[in-house]
């Protein structure tokens, strides 16, 4: 008799030319990832050739019960590390039946910014450092922690050993699964707080950064589901003298990566400072809890940048300063930020927005 594991790993390629496409979308909370699968007649490698689909938005907080149909539009395709073969993961965004984006569809606005000719010409690169915390399912307490608290921070960052590193098997599985899927995941590391980890998606261009980070989050959610562990993107899961969790966003444009780029970087950082409040408002919920000026953060109410200051709002690396070109790191985004929102706002502020007397208070103005 076949075991459940045998059927999960069943290879369909020798029996049918059909494939399974898992359609993924961002749910109504802005942080939940939802998905459902459908059968296609054969392999597809172009999202424009995939059929649109729909779902019950009243069950995800995205539509009322008396008009609940929400349309899924495929935007990006990834290899499916769970079903393997020709099966695919499909990142989608969501629309009303009349074609208007629903309020929780942040990709639509990001795609408009990234399709602007001035932005496209600069080829914006992003590298997002996604931090997260692994929690025990029954207690919602960090993985590996005793019922009370472990020893203070210090031994856990990038550590090895059963008394210092918790959940590495989950993290490594997610790492390999993302590579298999075709995500530009560039690394992983254990974080300062035990049970907390980080992966990096980099470099990714334009709206693709958001697509890739959301699918990486989905893969991580699926793997923790299998492991019976909860993944938390709360920016400060444990109060007190423990590091929070962020999504530091590294950024460069073609001009920044070229000779003389350091001056372009400094001008861009100046613009970010003028719109500090607007960026903070868009950089994730609960960000006031980690951004205290402690634990490698800047105070939420203050904008400061420096080389190579990890207590700054924006950090410039030594290599960038030395070479006179490169990238910078925005250290303000929380771990629960929406990558579509953060990446397009950074691009808009640094490339499309210009300060004026009427908006010099830092609130800024909408880009064209």
UniProtKB/Swiss-Prot annotation:
Give the EC number: 6.3.1.2
Which molecular-function annotation in GO is an example for this chain? glutamine synthetase activity
Q: Note the PROSITE patterns from the entry.
A: GLNA_1, GLNA_ATP, GS_BETA_GRASP, GS_CATALYTIC
Task: Give the record's keywords alphabetically.
Answer: ATP-binding, Cytoplasm, Ligase, Nucleotide-binding
Task: Tell me where in this chain the GS beta-grasp domain is found.
Answer: 19-99
InterPro entries given in the database record: Gln_synt_N (IPR008147), Gln_synt_N_sf (IPR036651), Gln_synth/guanido_kin_cat_dom (IPR014746), Gln_synth_cat_dom (IPR008146), Gln_synth_gly_rich_site (IPR027303), Gln_synth_N_conserv_site (IPR027302), Glutamine_Synthetase (IPR050292)
One Gene Ontology term of the biological-process aspect is: glutamine biosynthetic process
Q: What does this protein do?
A: Plays a role in the flow of nitrogen into nitrogenous organic compounds.
Q: What is this protein called?
A: Glutamine synthetase root isozyme 2
Organism name: Zea mays
Q: What is the lineage of its organism?
A: Eukaryota, Viridiplantae, Streptophyta, Embryophyta, Tracheophyta
Gene name per UniProt: GLN2
